[in-house]
Amino acid sequence: MKKKILFWVLGILGVLIIGGGIYAYNVYSSVSNTLKEVHQPLKRDQNNSNVGEKVSKSEPVSILLLGADERGEDKGRSDSLMVITLNPKNNSMKTVSIPRDTYTEIVGKGKSDKINHAYAFGGVDMSVATVENFLNVPINYYIEVNMEGFKDIVDAVGGVDVKNDLEFTQDGHHFAKGNIHLTGDQALAFTRMRKQDPRGDFGRQMRQRQVMQGVIKKGASFSSLTGYGDVLSAIQKNVKTNLTQDQMFDMQKNYKDCLKNSEDIQIPGDGHKAADGIWYYYVPDAAKQDLTNKLRTHLEVTK
């Protein structure tokens, strides 16, 4: 199931693509308009006409999946950070989940802090720059999802089914072990809990993937959804990306076989309070360099 994480990346933007790129003609216009609305280039790429060449040429690419914790007028912080690298030459994919409390330099801020604070300081542009600097790999594309509004997407597809391996209560919702059905509000609480989980941030990331995969499962039968308008509306309000519509379709066509050889990577480190009393996750230089080497090799980056 973890191999379907790419289908979340593509599917949350154009759920119809998941069914192999075939979708009903009568909703094409609505889907096209939605994908145009969610398109938001990075500031660094606004005058770069070659930004989409990697996808069209089927070269190795990287994607930053960013879940933003935005509530009301509060810009919030990045609730989750996941880097996906795809190499269509050997049909392989690597997924790296970055703990939100990772201590690193915040590019453009002139100081070090938790990596998820980059979003609060400078939005997706600063987040991309900070992740690039932390991993020492280029980030070609990003997909930003407002996790507060993600509940609307879950409700729009009729809720999702997940298998819960840890009984807990969060935000007034109780989650029993086993197979459970989640509404949008429940899904939001389900993906936010981490303090009761002995796996910490890694357990929370696992639950996020479960919910995302549940959305994709519903999206695979998009043409049968009576409320596809609600789905598109929720996506339009809560998703931003620098991928264009054509790039999404090229990616689905040219990179889908990467799912056949997928590797999930956890970043080793140690979490503890610093002298300022704040809890950080520290990644040893050697471990970070090993990760950098692995990703740069996968992306065929030589300089």
Swiss-Prot record:
> What family is reported?
Belongs to the LytR/CpsA/Psr (LCP) family.
What is the protein's name according to its record? Polyisoprenyl-teichoic acid--peptidoglycan teichoic acid transferase TagU
Its chief place of residence is: membrane
User: Gene3D superfamilies of this UniProt entry?
Assistant: LCP protein
Q: Which cellular component terms (GO) are annotated to the entry?
A: plasma membrane
Which leading EC class covers this enzyme? Answer: transferase
Q: Name one Pfam family in it.
A: LytR_cpsA_psr
Give the UniProt record's GO annotations in the biological process aspect.
cell wall assembly
Where does the record place it? Answer: Cell membrane
Bilayer-spanning residue ranges? 5-25
Q: Which organism is it from?
A: Bacillus anthracis
